Amino acid sequence: TLNLVNGEIPPMRYGGNYKSYGPQYARGIQEGNGKPEDGNLWVTYSMNKEDIWISRIPVPVRTEAGSHAKEDFSRYARLADLTEWNIYSPLWAPVSLETEAGNTWLTLRDKDPFDYAKVERKIPASRQLTVSFDLMAGQNDHGTLQIEFLDADGIACSRIELTSEGILRAKGGSRFSNMMKYEPGKTYHIQAELSVKDRNIRISVDGRPVGQRMFYAPVAS
């Protein structure tokens, strides 16, 4: 199989001669240059002939998920311990583990005008799925957080958003449905129930149903 290390290409920050889109000049640790202490693959590349990236790929390389997610981030001492996650952490949009209000959070920040932080957790293919998690926003007057549910090909069927207007909303079809307002610094327990058979998502916040929306793309699982 051919597996992507990074398949998403950000806009070019600036133009120039002989510049091409996408990851280029990929390099690994060649024979004779030593062996990584962690035994993993380390690959570097240039994105759009601008930023230089370093990717750590856990060995053995796995393409299938063996179990569903049940994470307690307080169990991890550092971000590198989250080997079940795919983490995309630009310099100006870093992903980190931080302590806030007595809890350890997987934290996404962003001040990059051309790129954004991204974390992915692959799970076994499911036609019926219930996902629950705690969420806390650092602000509600700028920035956007998107939570998407994807199939095995990376096609998103549903999306929950925190908008820069302080609204939690869900995308259904070609439209968005506002569900509630959210406040910065407040912890919300979100539960999403997805059904491929019914082609919809039901969302609850702190045990209270806030909306139901149809998938905006057909998926098999």
Label every PLM stretch briefly:
Residues G15-G16, A117-I123, F176-Y182:
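Beta-strand-rich interaction surfaces with strong enrichment in secreted/lumenal proteins
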Residues S204-A220:
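Short, solvent-exposed beta-strand-to-loop segments that form ligand-recognition rims
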